């Protein structure tokens, strides 16, 4: 799944791509396009091979894609140029140059892609429940990190990618309460057991962005647990990871 953002009268266009299970060359349970590098498949023949396959399929060079090692934290890294090494202990990448393509790797957590075509800024953010709260690196803070970065948050466009739905995401009450305190509107009930608490992280994230003044928020309707075209460890214990990428052309 991919597309181009409407950038109006500007000199760059924003491109985003979200992968599915289809494509790639791997075998079950990582069939066929596992973009993770730590989920039990052979890292040399699994995730790394899939990553090379992906960047070739979408017409990017391997050296343009900057991967990060996500840790359910709040560290934002501003990227000035492509690099071969994985960016460690980071959950958000931001760039104001056209060279790096920024991916976020997920299964049930929320991939968040952000862009503002006028100043030429993009970001990829990993958001998930961690330690009883919705752990989110603040991409808006990252945008403000350097000269020429975004100054008006209302111009930022946000895409919330595929994630687990609240109806399938049962959590203990203490976790639900903690997430709701940090990210209002995240709590819901599940269909697993009537009345048990669940988390709809995308609703809570959208609420946070609106509170920050961001108005253009798009929500990919697909749910990882319910959609067999996507990976989910609630379908099978061992499984792969999806990738969501954003870059400028």
Curated annotation (Swiss-Prot):
Native source species: Mycobacterium leprae (strain TN)
Family: Belongs to the purine nucleoside phosphorylase YfiH/LACC1 family.
Subunit and partners: Homodimer.
Gene Ontology MF annotations: adenosine deaminase activity; copper ion binding; oxidoreductase activity; S-methyl-5-thioadenosine phosphorylase activity
Cofactor(s) the protein needs: Cu(2+); Zn(2+)
Protein name, UniProt field: Purine nucleoside phosphorylase ML0918
Keywords on record: Copper, Hydrolase, Metal-binding, Oxidoreductase, Transferase, Zinc
The keyword Signal belongs to this UniProt entry's keyword annotation: no
Binding site for Zn(2+): 72, 109, 126
Tagged with keyword Metal-binding: yes
Role summary: Purine nucleoside enzyme that catalyzes the phosphorolysis of adenosine and inosine nucleosides, yielding D-ribose 1-phosphate and the respective free bases, adenine and hypoxanthine. Also catalyzes the phosphorolysis of S-methyl-5'-thioadenosine into adenine and S-methyl-5-thio-alpha-D-ribose 1-phosphate. Also has adenosine deaminase activity.
Catalysis performed (reactions): adenosine + phosphate = alpha-D-ribose 1-phosphate + adenine; S-methyl-5'-thioadenosine + phosphate = 5-(methylsulfanyl)-alpha-D-ribose 1-phosphate + adenine; inosine + phosphate = alpha-D-ribose 1-phosphate + hypoxanthine; adenosine + H2O + H(+) = inosine + NH4(+)
The EC number(s) this enzyme carries: 2.4.2.1, 3.5.4.4, 2.4.2.28
InterPro entries per record: Cu_polyphenol_OxRdtase, Cu_polyphenol_OxRdtase_sf, Cytotoxic_necrot_fac-like_cat
Pfam family, one: Cu-oxidase_4
């Amino acid at each position: 799944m991919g597309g181009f953002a409407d950038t109006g009268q500007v000199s760059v266009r924003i491109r985003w791509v979200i992968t599915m299970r289809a494509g790639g060359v791997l075998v079950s349970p990582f069939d066929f396009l596992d973009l993770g590098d730590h989920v039990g498949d052979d890292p040399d023949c699994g995730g790394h091979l899939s990553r090379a396959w992906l960047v070739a399929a979408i017409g990017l060079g391997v050296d343009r894609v900057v991967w990060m090692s996500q840790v359910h934290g709040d560290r934002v890294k501003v990227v000035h140029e492509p690099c071969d090494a994985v960016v460690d202990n980071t959950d958000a990448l931001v760039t104001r140059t056209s060279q790096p393509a920024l991916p976020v790797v997920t299964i049930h957590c929320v991939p968040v892609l952000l862009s503002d075509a006028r100043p030429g800024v993009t970001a990829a953010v990993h958001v998930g429940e961690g330690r009883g709260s919705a752990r989110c690196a603040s991409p808006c803070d990252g945008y403000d990190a350097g000269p020429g970065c975004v100054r008006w948050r209302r111009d930022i466009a946000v895409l919330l990618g595929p994630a687990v739905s609240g109806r399938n995401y049962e959590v203990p009450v203490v976790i639900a309460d903690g997430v709701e305190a940090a990210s209002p509107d995240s709590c819901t009930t599940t269909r697993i057991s009537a009345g048990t608490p669940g988390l709809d992280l995308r609703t809570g994230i959208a609420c946070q962005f609106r509170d920050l003044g961001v108005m253009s928020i798009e929500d990919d309707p697909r749910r990882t647990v319910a959609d067999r075209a996507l990976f989910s460890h609630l379908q099978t214990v061992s499984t792969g990871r999806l990738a969501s990428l954003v870059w400028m052309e």
